[in-house]
């Protein structure tokens, strides 16, 4: 039987609010499967040794949130299965060789192409390592491609199989007793099968866009030691205010583009570019109207 996971107060203090919420729910031992949605394609702040770093979500999960786990695996339909450390990959390879020997398969030469086949192997591996009291985290990115939204009757066989495995994990008391976490990442929760989203054993955590203070912190980090090109009429404060609704990566691109190309970063340019970015993010479903009372 696995040991009871306990939180580290110092560790949690350096995490953003949504990550602390995930940790609190996990440490309650009532939830082992989470859906991360919203601003999942952005940089995430983490404070370590008094310094704030901004990491892509995948790296944040591997290093900050699940950095103390024995095994951290990430799967997505296009990229396949990856591991946070080579030792973890070697451990999986050994387990896979044992699976092949027992079942007469040859998955060591190549994993199944279909997600349900991969999830079935992961199910076997997770159970094996949970029995060894290993601390495990599994991240499934672009989860909407593994268990897409839709009526069960219209789902393909592989999608139904994947959905059943995910539901089985959410129902499994062994996962709750063990130190195991499964995170499904889907930018738009509505694109993920509602049988998972609404499952009582699954918690949805929305990652918000940065607020004005968070944007200001990030902008100041980006501008540290550099000067905006001549003709720029924004300060860090006005940039943080006018950047409402933008991701950190979008702000980073705006600043980097201006500096590298020696182009002035102006309020007019920022307003126009912000309009284009927000409308593009919405897939043309929104028309952004710039208020004349912004400042």
Ranges and model annotations:
Residues 1-157:
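Extended, compositionally biased accessory segments flanking or bridging domains
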Residues 1-22, 31-37, 79-96, 196-295:
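AAA+ P-loop ATPase motor domain of ring mechanoenzymes
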Residues 34-36, 138-141, 181-186, 239-243:
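Extended hydrophobic secondary-structure segments that form protein cores and membrane-embedded regions
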Residues 44, 147-148, 190-196, 213-217:
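Switch/connector loops and helix/strand junctions flanking conserved nucleotide-binding motifs
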Residues 53, 57, 114-121, 135, ...:
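Helical mechanochemical/support elements of P-loop NTPase systems and associated helical scaffolds
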Residues 58, 122-123, 163-171, 220-224:
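Short, well-ordered amphipathic alpha-helices
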Residues 143, 187-188, 210, 270:
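Short, ordered loop/turn segments at secondary-structure junctions
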Residues 159-194, 212:
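Sensor-1/coupling segment of RecA-like P-loop NTPase cores
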